[in-house]
């Protein structure tokens, strides 16, 4: 918006004339200063106002300029008002209005203004160099570290040793649709946007910290939800000898050896269930030991849980008395995908030295190396008595020579759903050597009614005698672990351990006598 043009004529109003004189006098002196600096010349201004008051301006010294003026005798340019008006008329101005300044003159600035603008420009350049590189483009790609369970089973926060082997794969999400900050609301299921979205709840967290199944883990992106849970589209499972078998979410579920829970609707969420009982078996383990009072919750009906978020349960019956500080969620959800004991037999987590090999307990498919499983002493249990290796009975000629087996105590009350002995700390001994059957011995009824459970009878497992009826033929031996269970009460994930008919007349003395007679070669 330019200045208001006024007519160039004498101002009649005294006040306006004084104001105009003051402003334009300073403007004239400013132009003289700029001209003297830019063009390296000497300028002298002598002004007398209407009241004959003198105002002068000199670029250097007025006397020196006036001396030069008086002594100068060469032809020179001399202009008056008439000359200026004539020049303006030639340029197109009528001489009545105040002409617009020339283009070059309008762009000229004083040295002070030039310095100020130069400093401002330098400051802006510094700001752009400092902060300009961090401004993201509209479509940018930001690498995000997402835990992906790709090589082994899932990762759990375990203060005293993890049951499963953690394996994280760093993936880079470069889709601008997922990480673009221009979108105010990101998808909560951004890792698998093609699947239906469901809100995450606390049921999806196993033990409060399921890092690889939930996107609630810390993410480098500060713009909201990156992944509410891991993509249920792909989940690596171990099936037989294949460690990297990937099952798509839309494929049929792998066959299981036990009765599966009825699923009313198919959902694309995967669940890794290693402890499966037809009657809704739940295993509750504390941080340091097995809480026997929690055994009352074994018969909780699965219909009482209505959570729809994916759950991963890794509670195995062979590790109940180990005192491992992990907790398991009740397997009360849709059983679209369940891992059988044969599929879990080759997982590296179940064959680690810190835990009992599930493949040796359930399927007995592959010979395992002799392991040294930890045998902590849970409450109300005694360590197994040392065994004396003796020659094996000749009824089993097809069995190869056995190496030294290592015994792992297993709580009987947690292995039997619906068992009338939830509080009895009787322990079975499970060998981790292949081709060895398990001989289970339930406790006598007198121990159930005792206020304080006595020390349980722990005996080494060996091949039962032909005449002994303590091993159930319906359960099958461990050499045929792939065979379906004849009874619906127990699944093969329980290690095919089942109680035999309770002997009424046998006491602890008879059991301890068998400790010396039952031998293992």
UniProtKB/Swiss-Prot annotation:
The modification Phosphoserine is found at residues 98, 106, 110, 121, 180, 190, 231, 251, 444. Residues 3-57 form the MADS-box domain. Residues 286-292 are annotated as: Beta domain. GO terms for molecular function: DNA-binding transcription factor activity; DNA-binding transcription factor activity, RNA polymerase II-specific; DNA-binding transcription factor binding; histone deacetylase binding; protein dimerization activity; RNA polymerase II cis-regulatory region sequence-specific DNA binding; RNA polymerase II transcription regulatory region sequence-specific DNA binding; RNA polymerase II-specific DNA-binding transcription factor binding. SUPFAM superfamilies: SRF-like (SSF55455). It is found in: Nucleus. Keywords: Acetylation, Activator, Apoptosis, Developmental protein, Differentiation, DNA-binding, Isopeptide bond, Neurogenesis, Nucleus, Phosphoprotein, Transcription, Transcription regulation, Ubl conjugation. The record marks 288-289 as: Cleavage. InterPro entries: HJURP_C, MEF2-like_N, TF_MADSbox, TF_MADSbox_sf. GO terms for biological process: adult heart development; apoptotic process; cell differentiation; muscle organ development; nervous system development; positive regulation of transcription by RNA polymerase II; positive regulation of vascular associated smooth muscle cell proliferation. Residues 58-86 bind DNA. Pfam families: HJURP_C, SRF-TF. Residues 180-192 have a biased composition (Polar residues). The modification N6-acetyllysine is found at residues 245, 439. Residues 174-207, 244-266, 357-407, 437-521 are annotated as: Disordered. One of its GO terms (cellular component) is chromatin. Changing residue 289 to A: Same transcriptional activity as for isoforms with beta domain. Changing residue 180 to A: Abolishes MAPK7- and EGF-mediated transcriptional activation. Phosphorylated on Ser-444 by CDK5 is required for Lys-439 sumoylation and inhibits transcriptional activity. In neurons, enhanced CDK5 activity induced by neurotoxins promotes caspase 3-mediated cleavage leading to neuron apoptosis. Phosphorylation on Ser-180 can be enhanced by EGF. Phosphorylated and activated by CaMK4. Acetylated on Lys-439 by CREBBP. Acetylated by EP300. Deacetylated by SIRT1 and HDAC3. Residues 373-400 have a biased composition (Pro residues). There is a cross-link at residue 439 (Glycyl lysine isopeptide (Lys-Gly) (interchain with G-Cter in SUMO)). Transcriptional activator which binds specifically to the MEF2 element, 5'-YTA[AT](4)TAR-3', found in numerous muscle-specific, growth factor- and stress-induced genes. Mediates cellular functions not only in skeletal and cardiac muscle development, but also in neuronal differentiation and survival. Plays diverse roles in the control of cell growth, survival and apoptosis via p38 MAPK signaling in muscle-specific and/or growth factor-related transcription. Plays a critical role in the regulation of neuronal apoptosis. The beta domain, missing in a number of isoforms, is required for enhancement of transcriptional activity. Interacts with MYOG. Forms a complex with class II HDACs in undifferentiating cells. On myogenic differentiation, HDACs are released into the cytoplasm allowing MEF2s to interact with other proteins for activation. Interacts with HDAC4 (in undifferentiating cells); the interaction translocates MEF2D to nuclear dots. Forms a heterodimer with MEF2A. Interacts with MAPK7; the interaction phosphorylates but does not activate MEF2D. Interacts with CCAR2 and HDAC3. This is Myocyte-specific enhancer factor 2D. It comes from Homo sapiens (Human). The lineage of its organism: Eukaryota, Metazoa, Chordata, Craniata, Vertebrata.
């Amino acid at each position: 918006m330019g200045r208001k043009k006024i007519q160039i004529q004498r101002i009649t109003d005294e006040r306006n004339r004084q104001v105009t004189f003051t402003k334009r006098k300073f403007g004239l002196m400013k132009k003289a200063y700029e001209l003297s600096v830019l063009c390296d010349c000497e300028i002298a201004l002598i002004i007398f106002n209407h009241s004959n008051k003198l105002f002068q301006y000199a670029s250097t010294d007025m006397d020196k300029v006036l001396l030069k003026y008086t002594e100068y005798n060469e032809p020179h340019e001399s202009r008056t008002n008439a000359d200026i008006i004539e020049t303006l008329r030639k340029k197109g101005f009528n001489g009545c209005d105040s002409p617009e300044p020339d283009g070059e003159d309008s762009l000229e600035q004083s040295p002070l203004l030039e310095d100020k603008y130069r400093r401002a420009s330098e400051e802006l350049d510094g700001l752009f160099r400092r902060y300009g590189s961090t401004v993201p483009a509209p479509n940018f790609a930001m690498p995000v570290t997402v835990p992906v369970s790709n090589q082994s089973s899932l990762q759990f926060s375990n203060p005293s040793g993890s049951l499963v082997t953690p394996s994280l794969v760093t993936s880079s999400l470069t889709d601008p649709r997922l990480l673009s900050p221009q979108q105010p609301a990101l998808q909560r299921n951004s890792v698998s946007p093609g699947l239906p979205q469901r809100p995450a709840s606390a049921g999806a967290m196993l033990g409060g910290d399921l890092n690889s199944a939930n996107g609630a883990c810390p993410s480098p992106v500060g713009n909201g939800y990156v992944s509410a849970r891991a993509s249920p589209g792909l989940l690596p499972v171990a099936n037989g000898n294949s460690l990297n078998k990937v099952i798509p979410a839309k494929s049929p579920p792998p066959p299981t050896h036990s009765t599966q829970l009825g699923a009313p609707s198919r959902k694309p969420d995967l669940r890794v269930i290693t402890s499966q009982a037809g009657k809704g078996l739940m295993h509750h383990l504390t941080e340091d030991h097995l809480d026997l009072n929690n055994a009352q919750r074994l018969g909780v009906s699965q219909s009482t849980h209505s959570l729809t978020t994916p759950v991963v349960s890794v509670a195995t019956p062979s590790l109940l008395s180990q005192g491992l500080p992990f907790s398991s969620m009740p397997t009360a959800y849709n059983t679209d995908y369940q891992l059988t004991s044969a599929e879990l037999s080759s997982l590296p987590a179940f064959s680690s030295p810190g835990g009992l090999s599930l493949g040796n307990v359930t399927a007995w498919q592959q010979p395992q190396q002799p392991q040294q499983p930890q045998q902590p002493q849970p409450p109300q249990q005694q360590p197994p008595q040392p065994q004396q290796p003796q020659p094996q009975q000749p009824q089993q000629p097809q069995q190869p020579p056995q190496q030294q087996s290592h015994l792992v105590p297993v709580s009987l009350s947690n292995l039997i759903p619906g068992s009338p002995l939830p509080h009895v700390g009787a322990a079975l001994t499970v060998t981790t050597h292949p081709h060895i059957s398990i001989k289970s011995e339930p406790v006598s009824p007198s121990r159930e009614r005792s206020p304080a459970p006595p020390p349980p009878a722990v005996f080494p497992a060996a091949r039962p005698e032909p005449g002994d009826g303590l091993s159930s033929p319906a359960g099958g031996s461990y050499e045929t672990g792939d065979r379906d269970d004849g009874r619906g009460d127990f699944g093969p994930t329980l290690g095919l351990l089942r109680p035999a008919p309770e002997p009424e007349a046998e006491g602890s003395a008879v059991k301890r006598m068998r400790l010396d007679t039952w031998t293992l070669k």
